[in-house]
A protein has these predicted regions:
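Internal "kinase-insert"/substrate-recognition segments embedded within catalytic cores
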Residues: 106-109, 123-134, 153-158, 170-296, ...
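Conserved oxyanion/phosphate-binding beta-strand-loop segments in alpha/beta enzyme cores
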Residues: 69-133, 255
Length: 527
């Protein structure tokens, strides 16, 4: 009965049309248009159906028209068959607007449906695609912003494009067409395990997530709980993503055990007394820079799912590493930031002054942060590397002006051609709570302003913790007789930043003010 109810909940014959106004019409837009034709069939959660896709993209700065008959000479970026299904966990169950996963295929599924790799909207050639459906993220840019900021630093980050989607002639609003972490040459570029001379030391990807798959690997170690003690009731779950469990039968015997061993080797090291050893410690098993880059992206966004859900790790085999100049240690990539950047009202997700890696000390959940992130942060050498990397970030992509410029550019993209207005007319997101909003804005501008304020506060916190701070210059000052000064502050030069100034709620009348003192009665004395 439970399975039946779940299946019914996961699909509807009307394919979840817009809830505010299902009659919104798209005539023209600055965004690419994705037409999906399911011919009236019901889209399913667990099984794929055959559909057709056509993508119109006349190029940057050009208008795309929804009336194909009236505008027959438009550029068709791609047209063909796809195998389509719903995707996502919380993004599906808690959202009126449903995300899709699809694969490009040469023929309908009923005729074999062989996969075909294509490039969509300039993204890397592959056959596995996602249409994210931003709903709780009312800015619709949190994933895009995080990926674009992190792209120069990590080895691979998904590329993505905002689009407008039409399903069976009905307008469904703004979506994000994105690559997903995968084995393809233009993704993580993984071979089949054993493909390189039978080497079973890598070329796989695992995902730290829930135990909601039929097959997964449960770590022999437990995460830390509150008070820094190990919580033996909680587990670290590794899902098999590339290859999937179903693929093991067609791969060399022992592939699953080899994946488990590579996880064990890393975790055994972290659990050992000498894990900080620069040669034989954890640096032997993980690409430290990759883990730092993942950590900084996760902490900058204060992603409440970070480290413990949708956390992707991959590695190449030692043979490939030797032959192709790769690194065979575990690496990280990015995925799923729609409820990050102050967009969660649980686990203190709106706070800007906490660390996500330390979540286990504050919260209780079935999926906690793996123990080895705390082991990393407990290593002074790792902290030194982390701080140095953050300094590079702040001088590069994460500079205040660059972050603001990226946000403004994305906001303009979504508003200049009316896409945001149409999406709001269809779905009615603003002015109401959508799980798990920590902030409810009444307009797109409200949401963008909140995002900017939150980021500014988060950067201030991280800079204070990770960057060298200017030391206060304390020198003796003579205080007039009769005053017992608790604090003496020298007047700041005119060039000092206002953020560093000391302010009081009463005006000081003097010109110039060289020094002032505050006595035990809170009286201000200027001299």
């Amino acid at each position: 009965m439970l399975l039946c109810l779940t299946a019914l909940y996961a699909q509807r014959a009307d394919n979840y049309p817009p809830t505010k106004n299902a009659q919104v019409k798209l005539s023209e837009t600055n965004l690419p248009i994705v037409f999906i034709d399911v011919d009236g069939k019901m889209i399913l959660r667990e099984e794929r159906i055959t559909a057709k896709i056509k993508i119109i993209d006349n190029g940057t700065g050009k208008t795309n028209y929804a009336d194909l008959a009236a505008h027959p000479d438009q550029k068709v970026d791609y047209e063909g068959y796809i195998s389509l299904k719903y995707r996502g966990n919380s993004s599906f169950n808690s959202s009126d607007k449903k995300p899709y996963g699809f694969k490009t295929i040469a023929k309908p599924l009923e005729e074999g449906g062989k996969k075909v790799k294509v490039s969509l909207l300039g993204l890397g050639k592959d056959n596995d695609w996602v249409l994210l459906a931003p709903f709780s993220d009312k800015t619709m840019i949190r994933d895009v912003l995080t990926f674009e900021l992190g792209r120069p630093y990590l080895d691979w980050v998904p590329s993505l494009r905002h689009v407008e989607v039409v399903v069976d002639g009905k307008y469904y609003g703004i979506y994000i067409l994105t690559e997903r972490p995968g084995k393809g040459k233009n993704r993580l570029n993984l071979h089949d395990p054993g493909e390189d001379g039978g080497d079973l030391t890598g070329d796989w990807r695992v995902e730290i997530d829930r135990d909601d798959e039929d097959h997964y690997y449960r770590s022999k170690y437990h995460p830390y709980g509150r008070y820094g003690t190990v919580d033996n009731t909680k587990y670290i779950i590794y899902q098999y993503d590339d290859p999937e469990y179903e693929d093991f039968a067609d791969l060399p015997a022992g592939t699953e055990k080899a994946i488990q061993k590579s996880i064990d080797d890393m975790e055994d090291c972290f659990a050992g007394d000498n894990y900080k050893d620069p040669v034989n410690g954890y640096r032997k098993y993980i690409d430290v820079t990759s883990f730092i880059d993942y950590m900084l992206s996760t902490e900058f966004t204060f992603n409440v799912d970070g480290y413990r859900l949708s956390s992707h790790m991959y590695k190449y085999s030692e043979t490939r590493a030797k032959n192709e100049g790769l690194d065979s240690r575990w690496k990280c990539t990015l995925w799923d930031f729609n409820i990050a950047l102050g967009n969660a009202d649980y686990y203190k997700g709106s706070r800007t002054d906490l660390w996500q890696y330390d979540m286990n000390s504050r919260e209780t959940d079935n999926q906690l942060v793996p123990f080895w992130w705390k082991r990393l942060i407990d290593d002074p050498a790792y902290q030194t590397d982390l701080k140095a990397r953050w300094a590079q970030y702040r001088e590069g992509q994460y500079a205040d002006n660059r972050i603001d410029a990226k946000i403004d550019s994305l906001a303009t993209l979504l508003t200049s051609g009316g896409a945001m207005e149409r999406n709001e007319a269809a779905w009615g997101m603003f002015g109401r709570y959508v799980w798990p909003n920590a902030y409810v804005g009444y307009s797109f501008n409200d949401e963008i302003s909140y995002l900017k304020r939150w980021i500014k506060s988060r950067l201030t916190f991280m800079d204070k913790k990770l960057l060298p701070q200017e030391k206060t210059d304390i020198r003796p000052v003579t205080v007039a007789s009769g005053y017992n000064a608790d604090v003496v502050v020298e007047a700041l030069p005119a060039s000092s930043h206002a953020d560093n100034a000391v302010t009081f709620n009463r005006r000081i009348a003097c010109n110039p003010c060289n020094h002032f003192a505050i006595n035990t009665d809170n009286a201000i004395f200027v001299f």
